[in-house]
């Protein structure tokens, strides 16, 4: 195989799908480098999502479930309340998937910040937790959550929910 063959194949695929790739090598072996935003996409047409989850494996799966090419872009992931609040300050969020129990802090502060910050175009806030007890459900809705899902049985609901949100946004 020629040394530049893989690069030529990747470049061809990117060109065919009107995509670009970040040029950074990433933080280390086996780390993923995010694709750059498609320059032809109107940013206002994209739904911006935030994933707040302290388990890297679950966060990665949520990014896969929530992302829809040319429709939904995950603009940030956060494992702690502080990281999530910083992401809320940096980005306009249309959809947030929030775990309640985090490595530092809780999802309740994130929910309250999102609810306070989104004003006329409120973010859709989905709580996804392993602790789906009635008291936490009530507290999540009081803080401003729109949906309350149990990780053990509602995980597969997320793509359908994202589809419904996209249909609502389109209308």
What are these language model-derived features?
Residues 122-132:
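A short, hydrophobic beta-strand element within the central beta-sheet of small alpha/beta folds
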Residues 108-121:
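Short amphipathic alpha-helix used as the core "switch/output" element in two-component signaling
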Residues 56-76:
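Two-component/phosphorelay signaling modules centered on CheY-like receiver
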Residues 53:
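Conserved acidic carboxylate
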